[in-house]
């Protein structure tokens, strides 16, 4: 009987600690973060159009395209495809993405397409692409929008995020497309 009360006390203590105190502490700390821990929003005319850390689907020719998503950009079902690079289904899917990309960019050769433009990220929601992935789309976007390639290329170069310490440079696709809509 003594053991049962000890176990119940420990269980109650752990529930209070991890279900009440810890979440409240994290919530309190988040209040000091930008946007109070509610995510880094991107707004246009005071209307939230997306989040900086969650990718969105862009497949219109007048916008820059992001990375493909294994979960069709469903944030609730975030995840990769879990298929090996040697899986025939995966290879067929990547080939289909390459074919689609080449149809929209007939001036490119297959080997010029950066891997991030035809492979999904581990989360399936990556908001960023490589600068190379953005730069190879400049011609298509400029032609469709009837803008000079130089102007669109300058916009891309302005939106390249350099790594803080280590890593690679990236371009946030939503931020780039919002800035693109602001171009005249």
UniProtKB/Swiss-Prot annotation:
Report what the protein is called. Answer: Potassium-transporting ATPase KdpC subunit
Its main subcellular localisation, reduced to a broad class, is: membrane
Superkingdom of origin: Bacteria
Instruction: Quote the gene name from the UniProt entry.
Output: kdpC
Q: Where in the cell is it found?
A: Cell inner membrane
Instruction: Explain the purpose of this protein.
Output: Part of the high-affinity ATP-driven potassium transport (or Kdp) system, which catalyzes the hydrolysis of ATP coupled with the electrogenic transport of potassium into the cytoplasm. This subunit acts as a catalytic chaperone that increases the ATP-binding affinity of the ATP-hydrolyzing subunit KdpB by the formation of a transient KdpB/KdpC/ATP ternary complex.
Name the protein family.
Answer: Belongs to the KdpC family.
Q: What does the record note on quaternary structure?
A: The system is composed of three essential subunits: KdpA, KdpB and KdpC.
Q: Which Pfam families match?
A: KdpC (PF02669)
Bilayer topology term:
Single-pass membrane protein
Organism for this UniProt entry: Flavobacterium psychrophilum (strain ATCC 49511 / DSM 21280 / CIP 103535 / JIP02/86)
Q: Name one GO cellular component term.
A: plasma membrane
Q: Which UniProt keywords apply?
A: ATP-binding, Cell inner membrane, Cell membrane, Ion transport, Membrane, Nucleotide-binding, Potassium, Potassium transport, Transmembrane, Transmembrane helix, Transport
